């Protein structure tokens, strides 16, 4: 951007997260909700908390829709209670009644593919179409891409495994396998063409007018603030392609290791085994119950 001939930097203009009847956040105008899980809640005039995040991290929820000035007390009470019920359902395995599993699975799969090392703080949005029992809690949009490619190749994103960041750790480690199964299903659908699609998209940017403009802006940027020029746009694009080449095959191995328990048979036994519970934790003094042995469900009594 130039102002009166003076270069001021390179900016990306994008639409903010808001209700829009023509896009993925098409919540009902009178009874819909869009809220942000927000570590900077204290900057807002209105916010609310739920049980899962009322801990040391102190995350709160802030309003995207309705606007905070228009929120009625009964609306705040409703969405607070619904999210509290959702959080409890994730812990007890009944989450299928509360969340849109596909949208949650797509959200975390995208960040796993991108190797995001953040994505668990601010800019994390959920929506509910209306205040009826028929609508579920959704994750309609991805956000926060400044930490992509920072995980080691093959590693899941930070938000995947960190129980304090969001709900995903508990969704993957759950007696209800619906979430893990959907996640793996989505991965299998895109895996065959994913690398070629990403590669073609990256190369299309470097060869475009947009890419050439970025290259020019890069040099202007470094000249303005005295930085030493780093790689060209083409070199950065090749680095990204190389990273995906290294990352996706290893990620596939780790995804295949996720337990969805879809083909487990049950047997009864009184024999002594090293056993694991359904969350994959080794049990040193087994009690009566259901355990896993060599991918088989064992009823221990």
Which positions does each model-derived feature cover?
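Internal "kinase-insert"/substrate-recognition segments embedded within catalytic cores
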Residues: 3-109, 117, 206
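Residue-level signal for well-ordered, solvent-exposed loop/turn and beta-edge residues enriched
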Residues: 6, 134-135, 281, 296
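Middle-to-C-terminal accessory/interaction subdomains
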Residues: 64-121, 127-129, 134-261
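Residue-level detector of functionally pivotal "anchor" positions at catalytic/ligand-binding pockets or at interdomain
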Residues: 253-279
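C-terminal tail/sorting-segment detector
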Residues: 290-301
């Amino acid at each position: 951007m130039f102002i009166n001939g003076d270069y001021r930097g390179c900016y990306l203009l994008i639409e903010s997260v808001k209700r829009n009847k023509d896009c993925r956040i098409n919540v009902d105008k009178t009874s819909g909700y869009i809220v942000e899980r927000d570590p900077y809640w204290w900057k807002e005039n209105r916010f609310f908390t739920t049980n899962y995040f009322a801990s040391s991290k102190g995350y709160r929820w802030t309003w995207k829709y309705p606007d905070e000035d228009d929120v009625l007390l009964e609306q705040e009470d409703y969405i607070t209670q619904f999210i509290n019920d959702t959080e409890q359902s994730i812990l007890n395995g009944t989450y299928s009644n509360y969340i849109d599993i596909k949208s949650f699975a797509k959200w975390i799969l995208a960040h796993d593919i991108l190797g995001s090392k953040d994505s668990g703080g601010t800019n994390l949005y959920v929506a509910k179409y209306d205040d009826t029992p028929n609508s579920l809690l959704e994750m309609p949009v991805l956000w926060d891409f400044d930490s992509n490619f920072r995980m080691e190749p093959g590693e899941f994103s930070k938000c995947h495994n960190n129980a304090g960041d969001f709900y995903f750790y508990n969704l993957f480690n759950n007696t209800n396998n619906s979430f893990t199964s959907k996640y793996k299903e989505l991965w299998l659908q895109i895996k065959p063409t994913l690398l070629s699609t990403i590669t073609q998209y990256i190369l299309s940017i470097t060869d475009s007018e947009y890419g050439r403009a970025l290259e020019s802006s890069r040099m202007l940027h470094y000249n303005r603030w005295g930085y030493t020029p780093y790689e060209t746009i083409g070199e950065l694009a090749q680095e990204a392609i190389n990273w995906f080449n290294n990352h996706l095959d290893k990620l596939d191995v780790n995804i295949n290791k996720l337990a969805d328990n879809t083909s487990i048979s049950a047997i009864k036994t009184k024999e002594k085994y090293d056993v694991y519970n359904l969350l994959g934790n080794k049990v040193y003094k087994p009690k009566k119950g259901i355990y896993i042995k060599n991918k088989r469900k064992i009823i221990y009594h």
